[in-house]
Every structure is written in structure tokens, then in C-alpha cells.
A protein has these predicted regions:
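RNA-interacting cores
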Residues: 1-175
Length: 175
């Protein structure tokens, strides 16, 4: 299938409010911990950061269903629509669009869980609360992005990316 061609990035770097966040999952954890121990300067080509302090927060209880809905804010736009889903989305009315986006978000979370080696027995519930149902265009690929928040019964690490464009910083969540 379409999703089988992609691997979820195990190391993600986000720059939010002039802070750098490095997220490592599974085999991406140890390299990040090693890196933070000897990090003085980060050079991204167009911007260089001098590193004065690092904090490491490790959690083992992520990527699992929970018995309640957790609220997550989208710190960066969630790129929910690609060319294929975008053309389907455009012909829907607003009520259908909300259901469609809830299903896409659920699929994003299920994909993530499978990538982490988790076989879900429970249903994943999602409820989007977006600032607009009109997607913001993302680059020349005709992708569509949304801002706002969502609720789900799945525990996600802060600053992790969901949706399309993760390697470019899209879809960062905070709950």
C-alpha cells in the first residue's frame, strides 16, 4: 500500500520559539542522548545555534492507548491532505470534512503505532478542533495543512510530528 513505502522518522528536530527540540523514538533515542552530551554548536546552514544547556526527558510509557481523551495542540500545521486525499476532501461538505479529517488523524496515529511495533486491540478515537476547515496550501505538492488541536485516546510524546511533511517540521504536537 501507499503507507508501506514510508518509514516514520526515528529522529526529529524542531525549532520552536527559538528553542531546539530533538525527539528520538525507538532506535533514535540513543543517538540523541549521545549527541546532547557533546553538543556545543548546531549549524543548520542558514542559522547557527550555540548550545548552552540541554535537558533530556526520557519516557517509556508513550505510544499506547489510554482510557481517556488527551488534548493535543498542533504547534506546527498538520499536513493532513496530500494530492489524493485533497481531491476527495474538496468535494465534501463541512460536516463530512470533519469526519474525513478525524479518520485521517486516526490513520496517522495507527500508522505511527504500527511503526513502533504496537498492534492495537483498542479503537483509536479522534476529535479534531481546527481553526479553519479550509486547508492552508503547503508548497508545490498541493498538500493542505490545518492548525488547531485534537483529542485522542492515544498517548503521544510532545513535539512528535504526525501527518505528512514530518521531516520538514510539520505536525508537531503538544499535549
Amino acid at each position: 500500500t501507499y503507507r508501506n513505502r514510508f518509514l516514520y522518522p526515528r529522529v526529529q528536530i524542531k525549532i520552536l520559539n527559538e528553542q531546539i527540540y530533538m525527539v528520538g523514538i525507538n532506535e533514535g533515542v540513543d543517538p540523541i542522548i549521545e549527541l546532547t552530551e557533546r553538543l556545543d554548536i548546531l549549524d543548520f546552514g542558514n542559522i547557527t545555534f550555540q548550545v548552552f544547556d540541554t535537558e533530556v526527558d526520557t519516557k517509556d510509557d508513550q505510544f499506547r492507548p489510554v482510557g481517556r481523551l488527551i488534548r493535543y495542540r498542533l504547534l506546527t500545521p498538520w499536513v493532513a491532505l496530500n494530492q489524493m486525499t485533497g481531491s476527495r476532501y474538496r468535494i465534501l461538505n463541512n460536516m463530512e470534512r470533519i469526519g474525513f479529517l478525524n479518520r485521517l488523524l486516526g490513520q496517522n496515529i495507527v500508522f505511527l503505532a504500527r511503526e513502533m511495533g504496537i498492534e492495537l486491540q483498542e479503537k483509536i478515537f479522534t476529535k479534531v478542533n481546527l481553526t479553519s476547515l479550509f486547508p492552508k496550501p503547503v508548497d508545490e505538492r498541493n498538500w493542505g495543512a490545518f492548525s488547531g488541536e485534537f483529542r485522542t485516546n492515544f498517548l503521544l510524546p510532545n513535539y512528535l510530528g504526525i501527518g505528512n511533511g514530518i521531516t520538514r517540521g510539520y505536525g508537531a504536537v503538544y499535549g
